[in-house]
Swiss-Prot record:
Binding-site list for NAD(+): R11, V12, N317
Keywords: Cytoplasm, NAD, Oxidoreductase, Pyridoxine biosynthesis
Residues at which substrate binds: S153, C154, T155, R199, T212, K213, R235
A Gene Ontology BP annotation from the UniProt entry: pyridoxine biosynthetic process
Keyword Transport: no
Job description of the protein: Catalyzes the NAD-dependent conversion of D-erythrose 4-phosphate to 4-phosphoerythronate.
Gene coding for it: epd
Activates thiol group during catalysis, annotated site positions: H181
Localization: Cytoplasm
Species name: Pseudoalteromonas atlantica (strain T6c / ATCC BAA-1087)
Primary subcellular site in the record, as a coarse category: cytoplasm
Record: active site: C154
Name of the molecule in the record: D-erythrose-4-phosphate dehydrogenase
Assembly behavior: Homotetramer.
Amino acid sequence: MIRVAINGFGRVGRNVLRALYETGQNKQIQIVAINELAEPEGVAHLLKYDTAHGRFRFPVVLDNQQLVVAGDHITLLQQENIRDLPWAQLDIDVVLECTGVNNERVHGEQHIAQGAKKVLFSQPCGPDVDATIIMGINEESLKASDSIVSAGSCTTNCIVPVIQVLDEAFSVSSGTITTIHSSMHDQQVIDAYHPDLRRTRAASQSIIPVDTKLARGIERVLPKFAGKFEAIAVRVPTINVSAMDLSVTLDAKVTIDDVNQALKTVKNGRLNGILDFTEEPLVSVDFNHDAHSCIVDGTQTRVSHKQLVKLLVWCDNEWGFSNRMIDIVLVMNTLSLGNTGK
């Protein structure tokens, strides 16, 4: 049993726990502790009831300072400082760092200093972490000695597998991406102050451009594309599921059928469970609670002058990414058991 602690029980933290129980992987991964500054009553309530993902179908109760999920007791902590977390006492194998604010190697080192064996960040980190892992792309590069790891971002997990498939099949020269992302917690319900002036505006009333470092994230995982991709992002008034508008220039000449066939082929092969492909006339809500990292909408594939390709790629930016966090924990544990690091 892998002993895991979650630091920060927000959208990703809660969905990781939900996914563990819904998929039965709680038999392999035990959530031992949750560190969340919110009151325990709120922690339990938001685990049980979720606007995007519905009611949690497993029983949840509070027992003093413990959250009891389907009979499993989870210690609740409310520590602001990583240095106050009792990871050694709790014998934690992996900390899932899901606060959204701790994204530097030093934060991972603090968790390890407290007794955790490994740390997995739920967001992009700097190049000084031991590894950034995108499932289906580079998990085989992970070593047992890698103790501070990033799972990248939901958008990196969505777009990188598609780029990789296109590059292997047709050789990608360059590209641009527009992320069409659901609203997030750092936006305002009504107009209110924020350092980013665009994010001072009501999330439900506008399409809001925001900064993104997606292009740099692609380079970190696929270094051959350094300087060859650019990206912009907008937030739209939905609460979950996002889309990626990908345009790439290929070295090969292709048709729409060529592109779609290449993507169809891998969905049942090495990217099974990571990349999916659909030609049904679906809308964003149809992908809610979809565990794939990316779903290519083949009805929207376009080709111009045989070498410029445009794709629409969907993802449940919460559920898909949370499932990839679990996948990486399992890979980390397998490596630790095999002690294959160098």
